[in-house]
Amino acid sequence: MHVCEFCKKPFAKEKTLMIHVCEKKRRHLGRNEKHVQAGFMVFQKFFTIQQKSAKTKTFDDFITSPYYTAFVKFGSFFANTNPIYPERYIEYVIRSGVKLDQWCSDALYDQYVSELIKQEPADGAIQRSIKTMIEWADEKKSTWEHYFLYVNPNRLTHDIKEGLISPWWILNIPSGKEALQRLNDEQLEIVGPVIDPQFWKRKFKNYPADVELIKDVILEAKVQ
């Protein structure tokens, strides 16, 4: 008699057991898929933070959990979103108080980005903004210093909304502010929670050394 190690179902022949695929076995076979791995990572983090579990959850715990499907679904969302500061995003979602089945929400991620960029240090914001500009230049066969001169308004809207171009950067560059003026009303409404003029005016006033750092980088890089 041959028994499935996952569902404990008995089979008379080994060949029948080999082709048998129960739900737990299917989950086990998919353990190396990217979205499953992401879901498993978040599952472990959830029990560490929310349940204050001292014992690290295993993959066997994961595939037998009633929450497996929900975590894998979020794993797909996480992998596709490619969030900035991934660990911070996971912790943010877990501590948000939002129910697990509602984690795959663009609105929740937008809220995370909007709050995050107002808190992060200027140097991290600068590095990510320049990286985004370089990626754009590689795609367009251009130079990254010309990003604000030639970027498509839709692309600029996306990059700001996703936190890829920070207000630390765009609001301290003349061509950046000019690029914002090319956005239409709908696009301005989309980037509004990120480009919060009153907030950033106070921020720049309170952190003059960071503003000077940005201006030095702009001057040295000859951003146009």
Model regions: which residues?
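Charged/polar, solvent-exposed surface patches and flexible loops
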Residues: 19, 23, 41, 45-49, ...
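Charge-dense, extended regions
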Residues: 149-224
